[in-house]
Curated annotation (Swiss-Prot):
Promotes RNA polymerase assembly. Latches the N- and C-terminal regions of the beta' subunit thereby facilitating its interaction with the beta and alpha subunits. It is an enzyme of class 2 (transferase). It catalyses: RNA(n) + a ribonucleoside 5'-triphosphate = RNA(n+1) + diphosphate. GO terms for biological process: DNA-templated transcription. Belongs to the RNA polymerase subunit omega family. Keywords: DNA-directed RNA polymerase, Nucleotidyltransferase, Transcription, Transferase. SMART domains: RNA_pol_Rpb6. This is DNA-directed RNA polymerase subunit omega. It comes from Desulforapulum autotrophicum (strain ATCC 43914 / DSM 3382 / VKM B-1955 / HRM2). One of its GO terms (molecular function) is DNA-directed RNA polymerase activity. The gene is rpoZ. Its EC number is 2.7.7.6. GO terms for cellular component: DNA-directed RNA polymerase complex. The RNAP catalytic core consists of 2 alpha, 1 beta, 1 beta' and 1 omega subunit. When a sigma factor is associated with the core the holoenzyme is formed, which can initiate transcription.
Length: 68
């Protein structure tokens, strides 16, 4: 994937707001040392997070999905 676009990400996320939230959480995880879910690159953490979302490597979980 040469360039990641918002439209690529929105195919896997229900809204732009959810996309921003997911990307921000993933950037935090990456900065704390989480493993990459895509091929390593020299991109910034935000771009890596968006690429992972566009590649459908990250999924949005609903609060109602939690058991307990």
């Amino acid at each position: 994937m040469a360039r990641v676009t918002i439209e690529d990400c929105l195919k896997n996320v229900p809204s732009r707001f959810a996309l921003v939230h997911m990307a921000a959480l993933r950037v935090r995880q990456l900065r704390e040392g989480a493993d990459l879910l895509i091929k390593p690159s020299k991109n910034e953490d935000a771009v890596i997070a968006l690429r992972e979302i566009a590649a459908n490597r990250i999924v949005l979980k609903n609060k109602s999905d939690k058991k307990g």
